[in-house]
């Protein structure tokens, strides 16, 4: 019996390895209804880097219903959105060189995908982070929290 339990544990450990590796990335989708399919993302402190894979699952073009994924401290979100509107679509609705932006994808149209990888060292335990779409008017609905966890 002990050998069976031990063997089962070894088998579970072998199958969990890919799952553990996948914890340093997340897939997230944005729709034509101005929604992300996730409202919260947890990033393990054990990750050196974290990757966000964004897919726009809608059909509308980027100039009509474009979506991106932007990460900032929660306190910076509104100012980043405001400055992004002035920057325009050609700049991904983000002010050039904005140090408040910790990571972002490009603005996507329906059917498009993009990824961004960032250093987890940019995040501090206890700080509040928000991810959102910076396309004008989208941030009110298309946002969520990102949290650094053990």
Swiss-Prot record:
GO terms for molecular function: copper ion binding; electron transfer activity. SUPFAM superfamilies: Cupredoxins. Residues 22-150 form the Plastocyanin-like domain. It holds the Pfam family Copper-bind. GO terms for cellular component: periplasmic space. InterPro entries: Azurin, BlueCu_1, BlueCu_1_BS, Cu-binding_ET, Cupredoxin. Cu cation binds at residues 67, 133, 138, 142. Residues 1-21 form the signal peptide. It is found in: Periplasm. Keywords: Copper, Disulfide bond, Electron transport, Metal-binding, Periplasm, Signal, Transport. Disulfide bonds join 24-47. PANTHER family: AURACYANIN-B, OUTER MEMBRANE PROTEIN H.8. This is Azurin.
